[in-house]
Amino acid sequence: MMGKINQKMINNNTFSIIEHQAFSKEDLQGIFKEKAKKFYQELEDFAKNNENFLGFKNKNTLTAKNYVGIIQTKSGVLEILPKCTNLDGYKDKECKLSTILKEKLLKNYILNQISQAKTSENFYGEDFAFNPKTLLINMLKTLKNSPFKKSQISSLQISKMPLLEVFIAMFLDELDGVYKKGLKKDYISIEENRNFLKGKLQFSQHLKQNLVHKERFFTQSDEFMLDIAPNRLIKSTLNLLKSKTTHHKFKIIKALEMFDEVGFSTNYEKDFTYKISRHFDYYENLLSWCKIFLQNQTFAPYKGKNEAFALLFPMEKLFEDYVAHMLKKANPTQNTKTQSSGKYLISKKGEKCFMLKPDLYIENETILDTKWKIPDSNEDKKHGIAQSDLYQMFAYACKFKIHDIKLIYPLCERTMSLQNTIKELEFNANEHLAFLNDNSPLKTNIKVQVIFAPLPF
């Protein structure tokens, strides 16, 4: 059960929880009233086909998994936010990143700084608003080749809107930028039976259709039109979002008026293959948004009926990509590789098995593995680190011949106090392994350092 529900996190038809949080039909009644039963049943139907995203704790309770984002059904929206904070402690106010904090963030990802002192307990400052929604948006903005990257939406706007409305606002903001630069037109071949001669006369069709009507001409002409594939996709996205939004309906209706001359896309896949010329490359980000909404192109495609609409992202992947982005930005001269492969744990009859792919690899120096989890501080002997994670680190050290391993956890409200309780660990390499290229057993122990990475709240 969720227990106490924070009313600040409930907005209109949106119910907010954090990763791995459980909730029942009774928890929904505070906002959905008589619709709570129907909304819960719709979420149950979604969970039956998509247990990776939403599961059953028991017969009467659903539970979120490690995916964040939104699930919208006919009756409402379930908003799943990162587990960095407790919703009861969430402060509904602007928490815009200052220039100083951005500099502090970057500084904490410089490699020679990472290996030194732990991040200060008051890194974020006193009375800081740990806003999970702002965190999610800021992490999405660091994703490669994603439309989130260029969004200019403010933290204040984010804090005042449900997550789905934030995504819609980002799309509309991008559309506004495209409109100011000019909607793209192109020459389209049109065949039409006209009352006047225009373009090339199509003799075979002309004879078939105009044997009686001598005053008509069946012709083919090239028309410079707005009704092209990219604009059809944009109009189709606007039409979809008109049925999803409560905050932006008027703005979407006004935007649709700009596309009066444009039809709706009848084949998304085909229209997305349209080649954008370099003169109109400013369309690319907007079309990426169209893909997200029209084809659900997030990290997590889901199954089910059209009644459900979901935009979901795995937090482990978001955290890994965010840390990689910050490390590369803070250490431009280092060759930082993501998901580096080429090493296998075993070889069976000449076939390699069990590929080892650390999250981040700095060649011949360090392996960094991100863990989007809250270490258990009660496990004193294990320092809150899962045994399976240590086994994994040992395998990395052996195969990549690395002495320095770093486990990276998130620094947030729930991990601030853990920094001083989790100690640095060492594998006694003399007892356990020797690197093949060495003439003698390894003299240096393998250091495993636990690091708490600051997040972009």
Please describe what each predicted stretch is.
Residues 3-303, 307-309:
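Residue(s) in the substrate-gating loop at a strand-loop-helix junction
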Residues 1-50, 303-457:
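Catalytic core segments in nucleotide and nucleic-acid processing enzymes
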